[in-house]
Amino acid sequence: MLLARLAQVSREVAATSARSRKTVLLAELFREAEAADVPVVIPYLAGRLPQGRIGVGWKVLSRRVPPADAPTLTVRDVDARLTRLGAVSGAGSQAERTRLVGELMGAATEDEQRFLIGLLTGEVRQGALDAAAVEGLAAATDAPPADVRRAVMLAGSLQTVAEALLADGPGALDRFRLTVGQPVLPMLAHSASSVAEAVGKLGAAAVEEKLDGIRVQVHRDGGTVRIYTRTLDDITDRLPEVTEAALALPGERFILDGEAISLDADGRPRSFQETAGRVGSRTDVATAARAVPVSAVFFDVLSVDGRDLLDLPLTERHAELARLVPEPLRVRRTLVHGPEDTGAAEEFLARTLARGHEGVVVKGLDAAYSAGRRGASWLKVKPVHTLDLVVLAAEWGHGRRTGKLSNLHLGARTADGSFAMLGKTFKGMTDALLTWQTERLKELAVEEHGWGVTVRPELVVEIAYDGLQRSTRYPAGVTLRFARVVRYREDKRPEDADTVDTLLAAHPGVAP
């Protein structure tokens, strides 16, 4: 397949909001693709490189290269060139990358150059890999859409299913089954602003503790246990406690969904950072298990004794879970009948927060398990933390944000009145906010650098974040998890900003 064709479809998909039109465009593309093209076509449509990062920055891409007159590049040719680029290292690597990028761009037409620059800077975003892609693939291969959807769910990958369908036709779907030892992507939750909102949407529901641990999918086949993360990485050897817990259960063949969490001496959850350290690739497992022991807590069951339970309602899966897993290893939950029980749900949330957990997940009782999707029947509710911080510096953006000051350096007040940096963020900014922010920060600039500007610490910004973790990278000794801009607070002075001490007091146990 020519890159020009893929670039054209990507552009047309991005230009329409109609799912039906996206489906038609993607069906046409899949009909033209060969099975061998799929490992490149699918990631490129998603704006992702199969190679991951390849060390090519905006400075190299900004160099003007005369485009080719006619399209000749195939997607597989581009993939091979980018693989060579990613392998460049050592002395002279920057010059070699520049040369290889120049060769690639010189072989590309103007439209292809635009697509490649967007791909390499992360600016290809058209939401192609959603229901429209599944329906397009089904239409292209004369396969039932529901069967393709289920195969993608079980395979955890549209790419895997597309390769099979394009190579072998609809009969290939029979090979995609829920199987012990083959992980599936977990079901995820949407967010709700409150318990009342969640219960109002779902009606009869289970309200469960939301644990801030390591999401684990545990597979047991007789005496063999495998443990997978939410991204399907095998971490069996790093969590022997979870293996031991699974082997102690009465069932012989099952798949469980849950969390591995670590509690301190007072029975409160340790920080996510500490718990997540248990699965580091360089972790000494025995030493880590003594320092940060983990426990398995399960909240769902996907398969028992060869029976696929994904399509059963939550109430029936809960019953199966209770038969298999003893209460101490099951997540705490309460049941509500509808909005009239909102008070009980809010009380459960309050008790959950008091125990140190991060919130609750409200789950519709009649809902099936939608592997690999954010199901509308699971709604997570957790308090949103916000801070008033001061902008200390800002970095120039890349790609679509070129020429705009984008990545903010954030600081909190210290005891002596200075500001300690505790993180960066470029999230939560609209185009209008970026434009305003750039002009305002230019006015406050005291020093210019190649990467951006240092500014007078006068501008207060309200930041939302999901949690706090220790960090040796920043002077404050801690950093924010998933920080994003809510709004600027020009009504506040720098001395009104939150302090490092206040932040640490709000998150006991995370002090550096």
UniProtKB/Swiss-Prot annotation:
GO terms (BP aspect) = cell division; DNA biosynthetic process; DNA recombination; DNA repair; DNA replication
Determine if Cell division is one of this entry's keywords: yes
Record field: catalytic activity: ATP + (deoxyribonucleotide)n-3'-hydroxyl + 5'-phospho-(deoxyribonucleotide)m = (deoxyribonucleotide)n+m + AMP + diphosphate
Needed cofactors: Mg(2+)
Q: What is its EC number?
A: 6.5.1.1
Can you tell me which residues form the catalytic site?
Answer: 210 (n6-amp-lysine intermediate)
**Molecular function, one GO term:** metal ion binding
Q: Which Pfam families match?
A: DNA_ligase_A_C, DNA_ligase_A_M, DNA_ligase_A_N
Q: Which UniProt keywords apply?
A: ATP-binding, Cell cycle, Cell division, DNA damage, DNA recombination, DNA repair, DNA replication, Ligase, Magnesium, Metal-binding, Nucleotide-binding
Residues involved in ATP binding: 208, 215, 230, 259, 299, 374, 380
Q: Which superkingdom does the taxonomy of this entry point to?
A: Bacteria
Q: Which CDD domains match?
A: Adenylation_DNA_ligase_Arch_LigB (cd07901)
Q: Family, per the entry?
A: Belongs to the ATP-dependent DNA ligase family.
Q: Which HAMAP family match?
A: DNA_ligase
**What does the UniProt record say this protein does?**
DNA ligase that seals nicks in double-stranded DNA during DNA replication, DNA recombination and DNA repair.
Record protein name field: Probable DNA ligase
